[in-house]
């Protein structure tokens, strides 16, 4: 998984993820799934803010790379990925400037157009379950929540998706590509349910110990753990072509 992450994500994102894990005392050599999850979350946050600006009239506009009129105010302030001390300094500055209510937990973004903090979620589970977990954690109606899944589903506070459909489609396509690349390397199932994989492996090992003294009998059945670890092959026809400006996983 670590090799996949380093090949799949921009070095800047990988470096930020490494710093984040180090800050919390986590070992990326051991917590490889968390390493991948942090990189994915960081990239979604960056993609969420990319190309979105506010013009002189206070309107939200999309400006592509290379546009000569790019000297505009960024619509989103990226908080995720910063050192915690710096991140809280940014949050306090935003609150003092805009009058926004200070969140109890560090959010991921601030939307200058809608004047609200945003919590971004990327889940391998059901979007509504993860949404409720985020809502219970933030405990603030003023923090906007937007959840994306690897299956193309999304859920947002009051069904307000903030971004235009095309911008959200880019994020969904990127997540689907990550899922497909993981599956092609046999990494997806363990990424989705690492606890279940560990539970099944422990169960199988315990069964092997109990049966070690019994006569050996060849079985054609597949171990439950191996079934879980089998790659989930995806239909490549469903993968849309990503824009050249966005990161892609290298082909095998």
Swiss-Prot record:
Site (Important for efficient shutoff activity and nuclear localization): residue numbering on this chain: 195, 198-199
Keyword Ion transport listed? The answer is: no
Site Important for efficient shutoff activity: list residues.
Answer: 28, 65, 202-203, 206
- The active site of this protein is located at 80, 108
Extract one GO BP annotation from the record: viral translational frameshifting
Assigned keywords, A-Z: Decay of host mRNAs by virus, Eukaryotic host gene expression shutoff by virus, Host cytoplasm, Host gene expression shutoff by virus, Host mRNA suppression by virus, Host nucleus, Host-virus interaction
- Keyword Plastid in annotation: no
Question: In terms of domain of life, where is this protein from?
Answer: Viruses
Compartment(s): Host cytoplasm; Host nucleus
GO terms (molecular function) for this protein are:
RNA binding
- Entry note about domains: The probable endonuclease active site in the N-terminus and the basic amino acid cluster in the C-terminus are important for the shutoff activity. The C-terminus acts as a nuclear localization signal. The C-terminus is recruited to host protein complexes involved in nuclear Pol II RNA processing.
Summarize the protein's role: Plays a major role in the shutoff of the host protein expression by cleaving mRNAs probably via an endonuclease activity. This host shutoff allows the virus to escape from the host antiviral response. Hijacks host RNA splicing machinery to selectively target host RNAs containing introns for destruction. This may explain the preferential degradation of RNAs that have undergone co- or post-transcriptional processing.
Q: Which family does it belong to?
A: Belongs to the influenza viruses PA-X family.
Instruction: Spell out the protein name for this chain.
Output: Protein PA-X
């Amino acid at each position: 998984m670590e090799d996949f992450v380093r090949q799949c994500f921009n070095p800047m994102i990988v470096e930020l993820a490494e710093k984040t894990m180090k800050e919390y005392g986590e070992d990326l050599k051991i917590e490889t799934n968390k390493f991948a999850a942090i990189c994915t979350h960081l990239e979604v946050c960056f993609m969420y803010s990319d190309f979105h600006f506010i013009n002189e009239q206070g309107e939200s506009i999309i400006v592509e790379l290379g546009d000569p009129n790019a000297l505009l105010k960024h619509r989103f302030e990226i908080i995720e990925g910063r050192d915690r001390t710096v991140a809280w300094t940014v949050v306090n500055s935003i609150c003092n400037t805009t009058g926004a209510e200070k969140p109890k937990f560090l959010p991921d973004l601030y939307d200058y157009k809608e004047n609200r903090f945003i919590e971004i979620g990327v889940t391998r589970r059901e979007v509504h379950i993860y949404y409720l977990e985020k809502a219970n954690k933030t405990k603030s109606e003023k923090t906007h929540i937007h959840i994306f899944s690897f299956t193309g589903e999304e859920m947002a506070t009051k069904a307000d998706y903030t971004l235009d459909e095309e911008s959200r489609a880019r994020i969904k396509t990127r997540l689907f590509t990550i899922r497909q690349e993981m599956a092609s390397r046999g990494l997806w199932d363990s990424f989705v349910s690492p606890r279940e994989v560990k539970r099944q492996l422990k169960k199988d090992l315990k069964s092997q110990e109990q049966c070690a003294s019994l006569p050996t009998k060849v079985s054609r059945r597949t171990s439950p753990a191996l079934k879980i670890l089998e790659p989930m092959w995806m239909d490549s026809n469903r993968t849309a072509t990503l824009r050249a400006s966005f990161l892609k996983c290298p082909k095998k």
